[in-house]
Amino acid sequence: MSRQSLTKAHAKISELTWEPTFATPATRFGTDYTFEKAPKKDPLKQIMRSYFSMEEEKDNRVYGAMDGAIRGNMFRQVQQRWLEWQKLFLSIIPFPEISAARAMPMAIDAVPNPEIHNGLAVQMIDEVRHSTIQMNLKKLYMNNYIDPAGFDMTEKAFANNYAGTIGRQFGEGFITGDAITAANIYLTVVAETAFTNTLFVAMPDEAAANGDYLLPTVFHSVQSDESRHISNGYSILLMALADERNRPLLERDLRYAWWNNHCVVDAAIGTFIEYGTKDRRKDRESYAEMWRRWIYDDYYRSYLLPLEKYGLTIPHDLVEEAWKRIVEKGYVHEVARFFATGWPVNYWRIDTMTDTDFEWFEHKYPGWYNKFGKWWENYNRLAYPGRNKPIAFEEVGYQYPHRCWTCMVPALIREDMIVEKVDGQWRTYCSETCYWTDAVAFRGEYEGRATPNMGRLTGFREWETLHHGKDLADIVTDLGYVRDDGKTLVGQPHLDLDPQKMWTLDDVRGNTFNSPNVLLNQMTNDERDAHVAAYRAGGVPA
């Protein structure tokens, strides 16, 4: 296609957009942003010539690699520890992808720029493709992995699991509230521009080190589309910056979007990489080192900081606090311990830690053993049924954590937990910023300006409240996390598939589970103050 014909074709596509001049169109997806002064630029024009042939080639490579993995016996070599965590990851990730596809009509409706609508429509096609190849990857794992239990129920389990619902909250953020907040700042400017680096670049590297070369093939194919999505987001961001009235909203949304992405993505991907690997070479990057390279240098310094020249206040404090939480406060390690504590209500198995693991963690995170080593030794000791309860119900010096109302990751850095009465309910938050998000950002007014499109953080956001006072065996049964024999749990605290060493419903029966947040709301003021003070001091034995 010649340059002239390309220009003509692009102009013809733009003509398909109809803008009524005699009536005000109905607003389907509201936004508090204004675009009256916005410049108009279309990032699609540069790739229109090759888009469909390019995507076809990428799909062919993905499905060819899947066929090659089966023929090459990849599943004889892949580490079980790694693939078990993929049961959780691959149950979650297709949902944010399809939510991103659903977000594009929101952006198209909210942004009055026919030029950019083409690029957003193509992004919608991308996101559907991403979700499709990820679902096919999950199906291939299920059909060929030694233990398909968990892979075969991921769509159901994702929606009712204490960890999966964190990912659901993350993906729903793309399609709820203010259309620009959700579909542009939260999704494109932060999630796709920053955190896909660790999701789709750093994590595939770890997969390959554990004998899984299918996940890198799929997710590098996904990541190759992200540059166009980043361009879409940046174009809308520049349009919003053209109107000074949008600046407070942009600064609000950057704080919310950055922090919620950090809380959720770093929790999940950090755990998958650090605790799902068997590769303990000392020169292998830790998640903290990956984060410094991919998030701090590649995104914060190269993308966020230059926005200051437009007069935006960048959330420097939150970037530094996220780094501090990962490096100094052990955020990823706290998340891994929490997931392992909850193993009876998992639909994946979590491996025990070895001396090699301990040595690597201490090398990468000096002081790790003093804080986490003893607990993991207890996890190893309590891994098999018969003589003990699940570790969550044993005296191992660990108190089951409170859930954060906003990001839904528990308040694992206990000294930072915020407790406030909001909308008539005592709520717990993992941080001051998550409290601000609920109490200030997602409200009908922000800094004296009406923001009716932001919505609220509502619903049953604390998984534990749904199962308060129930027997653990009944919870597992209700969730459906039982194997085909009708008694053996899907989740196990080890990787041994010997039926004699696997936990059953009878092994976990008799343990009553209580919600920390329900109990908190039942306390008197004095009881609550004492409880919160003890929790912030490090918690008491469960």
From Swiss-Prot:
Binds 2 Fe(2+) ions per subunit. Its EC number is 1.14.13.227. SUPFAM superfamilies: Ferritin-like. It catalyses: propane + NADH + O2 + H(+) = propan-2-ol + NAD(+) + H2O; acetone + NADH + O2 + H(+) = hydroxyacetone + NAD(+) + H2O; butan-2-one + NADH + O2 + H(+) = 1-hydroxy-2-butanone + NAD(+) + H2O; phenol + NADH + O2 + H(+) = hydroquinone + NAD(+) + H2O. The keyword Metal-binding applies. Induction: By acetone. Transcriptionally activated by MimR. It is an enzyme of class 1 (oxidoreductase). Its cofactor is Fe(2+). Keywords: Iron, Metal-binding, Monooxygenase, NAD, Oxidoreductase. One of its GO terms (molecular function) is monooxygenase activity. InterPro entries: Ferritin-like_SF, Phenol_Hydrox, RNR-like. The keyword Metal-binding applies. Pfam families: Phenol_Hydrox (PF02332). Fe cation 1 binds at E97, E127, H130, E226. It comes from the Bacteria. Fe cation 2 binds at E127, E192, E226, H229. Belongs to the TmoA/XamoA family. The propane 2-monooxygenase multicomponent enzyme system is composed of an electron transfer component and a monooxygenase component interacting with the effector protein MimD. The electron transfer component is composed of a reductase (MimB), and the monooxygenase component is formed by a large subunit (MimA) and a small subunit (MimC). Requires the presence of the chaperonin-like protein MimG to ensure a productive folding, resulting of a soluble MimA, which leads to the active form of MimABCD. Component of the propane 2-monooxygenase multicomponent enzyme system which is involved in the degradation of propane via the O2-dependent hydroxylation of propane. Also involved in the degradation of acetone via the O2-dependent hydroxylation of acetone. Also able to catalyze the oxidation of phenol, methylethylketone (2-butanone), 1-propanol and 2-propanol. This is Propane 2-monooxygenase, hydroxylase component large subunit. It comes from Mycolicibacterium goodii.
